[in-house]
């Protein structure tokens, strides 16, 4: 996600507030992902259909559940690291990733004003190094468990920022409310904990399903101690309470 003050308008590229070159990369990333994901998804469906029995269905459901759990955990890891390690000046990731998370805590509602491309394109982009080899070179599409796991994992990864946006949006579509109520995707009430002092837990933003367990086992304090230690070498400073902004 990018934030600046001047808006650019284009019939082809939409409305955006950052360099046109970045906008083009974002749109191309989404388009490339859509093509390769469709191919991989069809292979996954075929793999499940070719050996459809009770065991296959059970493994498929298990794969989907594990994929959701992993996607949620990964979202929390990325979120926590970007909140607490490095700075906007960190090479490679500073401007593209860390900046978005830091600015989100200054103005949590900024992402609700962004369009689909601005909010989600980064996640489409980071999936391509996994998706493209799976389609072109790796024979994982023929395995029902592995293919289902990857299809569901990438689906949740690419929509994580959209889910996060919904958690900050007052009015969302009925189906989204249904998913939020059943904790399939992140709910506003659950996410509000992260925007409440001391701002040091509930980093997972896909469904939030892993937050209670990670909090109970004391995972976040350990990770934050690591960030403070690593920060001595990598530079930067964590987001502080005064920069966390208003609640969810």
For the regions a protein language model found, what residue spans apply to each?
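Cytosolic/stromal cytosol-facing helical appendages immediately following the last transmembrane segment
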Residues: 1-24, 54-58, 89-90, 106-117, ...
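Interfacial segments of alpha-helical transmembrane regions
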Residues: 53-67, 141-156
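Core segments of transmembrane alpha-helices
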Residues: 29-37, 118-136
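Membrane-helix interface/capping segments
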Residues: 76-110
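Transmembrane alpha-helical segments that form the membrane-embedded catalytic/substrate-channel core
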Residues: 69-82, 151-172
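The first (N-terminal) embedded transmembrane alpha-helix
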Residues: 21-44
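Transmembrane alpha-helices and immediately adjacent membrane-cytoplasm interface residues
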Residues: 66-74, 133-137
């Amino acid at each position: 996600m990018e934030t600046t003050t001047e808006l650019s308008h284009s019939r082809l590229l939409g409305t955006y507030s950052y360099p046109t070159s970045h906008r083009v990369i974002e749109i191309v990333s989404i388009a490339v992902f859509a093509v390769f994901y469709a191919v991989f998804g069809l292979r996954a469906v075929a793999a499940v259909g070719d050996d459809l029995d009770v065991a296959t269905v059970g493994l498929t459901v298990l794969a989907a559940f594990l994929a959701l759990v992993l996607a949620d955990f990964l979202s929390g890891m990325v979120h926590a690291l970007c909140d607490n390690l490095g700075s906007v000046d960190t090479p490679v990731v500073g401007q593209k990733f860390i900046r978005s998370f830091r600015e989100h805590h200054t103005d949590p509602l900024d992402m609700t004003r962004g369009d689909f491309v601005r909010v989600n394109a980064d996640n489409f982009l980071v999936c391509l190094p996994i998706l493209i080899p799976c389609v072109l070179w790796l024979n994982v599409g023929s395995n029902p468990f592995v293919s289902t796991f990857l299809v569901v994992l990438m689906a949740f990864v690419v929509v994580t920022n959209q889910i996060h946006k919904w958690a900050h949006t007052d009015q969302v579509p009925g189906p989204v409310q249904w998913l939020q109520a059943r904790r399939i995707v992140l709910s506003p009430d659950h996410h509000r904990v992260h925007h409440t002092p001391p701002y040091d837990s509930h980093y997972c933003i896909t469904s939030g399903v892993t937050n209670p367990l990670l909090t109970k086992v004391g995972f976040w304090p350990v990770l934050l101690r690591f960030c403070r230690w690593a920060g001595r070498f990598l530079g930067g400073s964590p987001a502080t309470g005064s920069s966390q902004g208003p609640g969810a």
